[in-house]
């Protein structure tokens, strides 16, 4: 018999009755029922009930065991007594009568419980992550993550992609988020950077004659904490393709993403035919560029009904052509208590309030707005929104460029409060036609809106002759249930177009050469048309595991202060290490 086990703790069935077996694992739970000890023994594969009564030769040893001790148990498999079977366990028909116990690893008193899923302070969970990972839900999430990554790889290869690994030590770029810098010992005063993404390398691969690349790429960004991203590092399914247009990328990616979601959705419906929603339309209907399409509430422009009306606040706003009034339908929300609650919520979000109209049983409108604009305008709004008695509508007004984010939050809040969001499906969509540029109010200049390497729609002609703020890019995102899970674009592969694109954003050709010299040089030697994207592995796994916390799907994450509490990082280093790197510390004074 093997030194530690003949079977795993999830393997034994009623077909193993009367066999002598050996199991090794952790003491998950120990119970004393009238002098009979029941030990639930757990390993990676499952859990088996083991029994020692006073007649067992191992009873004295069993009495010494405590939670999370690692033990080897020898014994005989037998059927559980009638009525004590556990249908929730694959091993629930049998138990092991213990003949011998060997303690392989005793455990100190636990700083957090492994048995059960009770909430515990996050810092304790992260400091003792090796214990936290023994808990069933988190353990299963990590296993699911591995299976999802395997599925991604398999499906990418089925689409003709080949996996490459790009460098981890690369050059720093001042664009985007802050880099994690790595000092060079051999080149004093110079630094490598950990890649924020393999963007330039994957484009260089296309210029090197490769056709379809992918990798599960680690990415590093020295960003301030964000709720939707782990500090420090994250992983993405990165891909690039040569000689493609936007539709070719969509055709290659959709089967991969749809297939992964269908495989791990646990029966929940997954979008078959992805809609393509222009960026401007997404803001207009949903108040966000990552809409949750499970929410059926759609915003509409109702400016015409308030222009010249008796509600002077909106009427005066609409004298400025850039201002609009948007309505968010609230089916079933036509009570004063509900409308007042939404108004209070808006004030809590820093807004002056949230205007509303309610429709009574007779069909007449009620509320301050209805009283000011009159029954005809109120009825016209009801008909436009398709509402009925007992419903309400909520209104935001002003410059859409300034209020669309709040309008999107209000739409989401209404969907949640009215319980109209179907939580049991995955709604995937493409968001397309992103603006190439945006106006930076702080610096009073035109900036890139998203990826600076994207191809402008209309090419060099658009860059030369069009108002930059009207140029759209071949840039696209994948959204799912209110999250952006992937982003990409067709690349600007012509050097003259690349230089012009950066010039509009305030960078000269010398800046381009200095910051992106390797790729710019490659453009001079025959660059194919190419495009690609990257999908956030962490967010995909988070959605499929049914959690909203990225730490629940990551092995050893940092806390929100970018600290690894288990390993003690970041940490001090020795003066000798600093001298070797020619670094002297100049720390802020407390």
UniProtKB/Swiss-Prot annotation:
Highest taxon listed in the record's lineage: Bacteria
Chain sites annotated for binding ATP: 221-223, 484, 536-539
Enzyme Commission numbers on file: 6.1.1.23
One GO process term, biological-process aspect: aspartyl-tRNA aminoacylation
Subunit structure, as described in the record: Homodimer.
Function: Aspartyl-tRNA synthetase with relaxed tRNA specificity since it is able to aspartylate not only its cognate tRNA(Asp) but also tRNA(Asn). Reaction proceeds in two steps: L-aspartate is first activated by ATP to form Asp-AMP and then transferred to the acceptor end of tRNA(Asp/Asn).
Designated name of the protein: Aspartate--tRNA(Asp/Asn) ligase
Organism the protein comes from: Nitrobacter hamburgensis (strain DSM 10229 / NCIMB 13809 / X14)
